[in-house]
């Protein structure tokens, strides 16, 4: 997949996968490294370094809005959603924006988010994680270490209730 292209699996809620630019990734990392405001008390992660961004609206939203517009376009045109279910133009209100610096043996358990849409970006992924993932897939009956999994509904016969994959650096997922 190339920057600007996207793909989403057909199951439950619409999940849009795309790739963010290197400059956006770097800005998020640079600003994330500046903040040291601990945010663990608000998050589900079993991660030691989870920090909330401060004063991000002016630089973040201009970069992020085109992704929301792509989500809206795909919801209406590819997914068959109704325009009435998405307010236009977008009224963007954010609760918080945070960054996780996740290390070996740390993880995010299954959890949910508030709001109409949520997203996750993978800004930096160690090469060793892909190797570890490949090794563990040969031993265990799962997709291995470092994956992200989206759930929707019940696990019933002939029903795809989840999607799981190992993300790449720069991947972003937006979901309802």
Residue ranges and their predicted role:
Residues 96-174:
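Catalytic core of non-heme Fe(II) oxygenases with the double-stranded beta-helix
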Residues 1-91, 96-98, 102-108, 144-147:
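Non-heme Fe(II)/2-oxoglutarate
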């Amino acid at each position: 997949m190339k920057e600007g292209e996207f793909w989403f699996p057909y199951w439950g809620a619409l999940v849009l996968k795309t790739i963010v630019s290197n400059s956006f990734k770097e800005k998020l990392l640079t600003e994330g490294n500046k903040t040291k405001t601990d945010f663990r008390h608000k998050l589900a992660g079993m991660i030691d370094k989870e920090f909330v961004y401060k004063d991000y609206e002016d630089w973040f939203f201009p970069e992020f809005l085109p992704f929301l517009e792509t989500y809206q376009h795909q919801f209406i045109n590819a997914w068959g959603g109704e325009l009435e279910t998405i307010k236009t133009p977008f009224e963007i209100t954010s609760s918080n924006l945070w960054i996780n610096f996740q290390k070996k043996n740390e993880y995010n358990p299954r959890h949910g988010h508030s709001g109409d849409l949520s997203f996750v970006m993978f800004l930096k992924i160690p090469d060793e994680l892909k190797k570890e993932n490949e090794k563990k897939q040969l031993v265990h009956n799962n997709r291995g270490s470092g994956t992200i999994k989206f759930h929707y509904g019940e696990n019933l016969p002939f029903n795809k209730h989840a999607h799981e994959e190992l993300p790449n650096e720069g991947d972003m997922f937006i979901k309802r």
